[in-house]
UniProtKB/Swiss-Prot annotation:
UniProt cross-references to HAMAP family, sorted A to Z: Pro_tRNA_synth_type1 (MF_01569)
EC class name: ligase
EC number: 6.1.1.15
Nucleotide-binding in keyword set: yes
Catalyzed reaction equations: tRNA(Pro) + L-proline + ATP = L-prolyl-tRNA(Pro) + AMP + diphosphate
Lineage: Bacteria, Pseudomonadati, Myxococcota, Myxococcia, Myxococcales
Protein name per UniProt: Proline--tRNA ligase
BP-aspect Gene Ontology terms: prolyl-tRNA aminoacylation
Functional description taken from the UniProt entry: Catalyzes the attachment of proline to tRNA(Pro) in a two-step reaction: proline is first activated by ATP to form Pro-AMP and then transferred to the acceptor end of tRNA(Pro). As ProRS can inadvertently accommodate and process non-cognate amino acids such as alanine and cysteine, to avoid such errors it has two additional distinct editing activities against alanine. One activity is designated as 'pretransfer' editing and involves the tRNA(Pro)-independent hydrolysis of activated Ala-AMP.
UniProt subcellular location: Cytoplasm
Amino acid sequence: MPVVRLSQAFVPTLKEAPADAQVASHKLLVRAGFIRQLGAGIYDYLPLAKRTLAKIEAIVREEMDAIGGQEFYLPALHPAEIWKESGRWEVMGDNMFRLKDRKNGDYCLGMTHEEIFTAIARDELRSYRQLPQVWYQIQTKFRDEPRPKSGLLRVRQFTMKDAYSFDVDRAGLDKSYEDQRRAYERIFTRCGLDFVAVQAHSGAMGGSESSEFMVRTDAGEDLVAACPRCRYAANTETATSRLASEQDGAGLPKPEKFATPGVVTIEALEQPPYGVAARRQLKTLVYVADEKLVVAVVRGDQELNEAKLQTATGAQVIRPAHPEEIPSLMGARAGSLGAVGFSRAKVFVDPSLADRKDMVTGANEDGFHLRGVEVRRDVLTGPHATVAELRTVRAGEGCPRCDGTLDVFKALEVGHIFKLGTKYSESMKATVLDADGKAVPIVMGSYGIGVERIMAAAIELHHDELGIRWPPAIAPFQATVLTLGPEPELKKAADELVKALSDAGLEVLHDDREERAGVKFKDADLVGIPLRISVGKKGLAEGKVEWKLRGDKAVELVPLAEVARRAAEHVRAGR
């Protein structure tokens, strides 16, 4: 194996992290000389990062090929027409980088490649006999992220492995999806990640089912609800829970209006003279779903989950209504809104409210509320009212599958798999002839992995106050040899040891710089190569060198003649 000499290598380590770096992976990747920032959400990957990313990509390729994947490399520049076929040209909104060529043609930089792969399938696949197919690529993607931050965790240019399965029916899709799920588990395990697969929201991708692969870390921006008893786990965008039952009063024969001047918040209605607990209030919110106003109702002490509302509405895009949009629909401003007897728009009510009585809500008249509201009688009888999961689950609520209690924690998404079904094949007219000679839409799946996110997630999980502690399979080198002095005999012994390690098949970084031992030790800990072997004057006098594993405090003296064999065995054991 080739040897890299640190005296000749480009590894620009730093003593301090950038002032704007907040998460460990960002701080350490910059300090250890792996990345540099070019612009907001745009990073240079330096030689050490390129080595680690190449190892991650190799693992991904091995596991994709093992399930019959065939690798492609498709353009990052896409004509607008193909995105318009699927309807996503408008859906992607400002997240998509768009540009025009010199002939004023519309193009975009690809965020993902469902449309492109579907077009190939449409043009080339004719019969069910050609299915199943599993196609993938490892390629650069672009997203006009509004708030790039956290180093490689939220960027505008990134590398993704995106795979696509093509089957003749749902049973085939189920098998392809399961193959991908198992492959993802192997990939993340080999990369040293502690992960959990969770139920997820499909979002703009669409489809009937999706799962995310999450790494538990405070650097994550997603929230996962999980039950330690039965292993239930879901992104809070889809998670459900059991709530403790509420004891409502007898209520009133019909809602009764009462004056609440100046009361426009849940908290204000809790105060005297009203004293209405938040759990007895109906929170009524107005949203715009695909340019149509809709109403969502959750309990006063609960939070609306926008992803769940998007699922309930079936909309491609949702947003909170602007204050000026609300009065024309509701007859009042925010703070006095309610859905009693409301029929001017679709109304979605969280199931935890369906059987509640004696509730309080806005009267759709500024300065007034209604008491004695019975949700099923007064809200759900509306012509456009329906029950739908809307609220965000919280830690301590009951598990929906067993009598356990949910934990809610931050997590980082490193992979996402989708059952797309016929969403793209129908809109783009990608069909094959089935066994009966009938044209049927191809049934598709989509499967993504963030390559740089694996690298960053590994650091979030494996680091200490000294630096990175790379999982062996994705470390930039397997061993580093430190020459601890200028003496010719030390240099000669180190050179011979490095050659022996290389001949034994190890990837070695040789720190042969004219630097103090303390500097070399600090850089070795910072860069995080799993095995450190130090050639010093004292040990060499006894025919030995120092052997230390990154993360272990113990330093062992090992006979020089045994080091190469022992190191090779150590690497083969995956340590």
